[in-house]
From Swiss-Prot:
Protein's gene: yuzD
Any matching Pfam family: DUF1462
Highest taxon above the source species: Bacteria
Keyword Transit peptide: no
Protein name, entry field: Putative disulfide oxidoreductase YuzD
Residue pairs linked by disulfide bridges in the UniProt entry: 16-19
Keywords: Disulfide bond, Redox-active center
Protein's organism: Bacillus subtilis (strain 168)
Length: 108
């Protein structure tokens, strides 16, 4: 069995200024999790939500959170493992493509 990939969704409680009328980062986390479970059933993956104002004690997470706060990236910022696959309004297609590079296959 393959090692489950880690998906990270960086965001904040409030919607980013450039992302008005789009889902919040928490909403993005939830719909992304639901979509991935439907597309890749019985293929485990891990997800984490990272608040950009209180990132975990991890240098990589802190650096990304700071870049988002400094407007270098829009949030929600979505990563598969350590690869950025979407920001602001992430596209499922891009997330799926990266998941499939890690061996995930669509349930048919």
């Amino acid at each position: 069995m393959m090692k489950p990939v880690m998906l990270s969704v960086y965001g904040a409680e409030n919607v980013c200024a450039s992302c008005v009328n789009m889902p919040t980062a928490k909403d993005t986390y939830e719909w992304l999790e639901a979509a991935l479970k439907r597309k890749y059933p019985n293929q485990p993956f891990e997800m984490q939500y990272i608040d950009i104002h209180e990132p975990p004690d991890n240098e990589h997470a802190k650096e990304l959170a700071e870049k988002i706060r400094n407007d270098e990236y829009f949030y929600p910022l979505v990563l598969v493992e350590d690869k950025i696959v979407g920001e602001g309004n992430p596209k499922l297609k891009d997330v799926y493509e990266e998941m499939e590079k890690h061996g995930y296959t669509e349930n048919r």
